[in-house]
């Protein structure tokens, strides 16, 4: 594993984008200026579904061992910023424009952090494409965002692929 990937990246926020064939998760760092996208991971819808399941399992194990994650402190913003506003404030380095493709994910946790290894499983050797660390307080919100994005993706794109907008086998 390249040293750059092995060290991992701590992130303070996430943005999930989707298209018919893939999801893009941008991991943000907003502690120091310039605010920036610190990692971009490209996943298939199936891999995002597996990510949601694995994250839920890890959150359940975390809750069993340590109790529920503490809530993120601070005021709730009056409104969510638009995608355009986010990317006006967070610099996207040129080397991250294409992102890192992954077709599996490994998740683990400690009492204070979760980690995600996004893995590219190609012959002859699988490799970690990105390693992300998240504070435990962010996990419930991130999991909700993933699940919400999956539902929106299904409503937006899967109906288009079905003949006459009907579910297969119902007509």
Give residue spans per PLM region.
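Positively charged, low-complexity terminal tracts
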Residues: 1-171
């Amino acid at each position: 594993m390249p040293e750059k990937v092995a060290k991992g990246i701590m992130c303070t926020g996430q943005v999930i984008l989707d298209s018919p064939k893939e999801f893009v998760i941008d991991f943000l760092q907003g502690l120091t200026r310039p605010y920036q996208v610190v990692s971009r991971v490209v996943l298939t819808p199936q891999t995002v579904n597996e990510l949601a399941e694995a994250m839920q399992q890890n959150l359940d194990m975390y809750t069993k061992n340590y109790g529920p994650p503490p809530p993120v402190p601070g005021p709730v913003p009056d409104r969510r910023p638009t995608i355009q506003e986010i990317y006006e404030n967070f610099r996207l380095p040129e080397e991250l424009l294409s992102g890192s493709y992954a077709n599996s994910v490994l998740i683990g946790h400690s009492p204070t952090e979760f980690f995600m290894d996004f893995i590219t499983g190609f012959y002859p050797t699988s490799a970690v494409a990105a390693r992300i660390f998240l504070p435990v307080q962010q996990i419930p919100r991130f999991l909700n965002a993933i699940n919400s994005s999956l539902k929106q993706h299904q409503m937006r794109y899967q109906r288009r692929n079905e003949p006459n907008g009907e579910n297969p086998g119902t007509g």
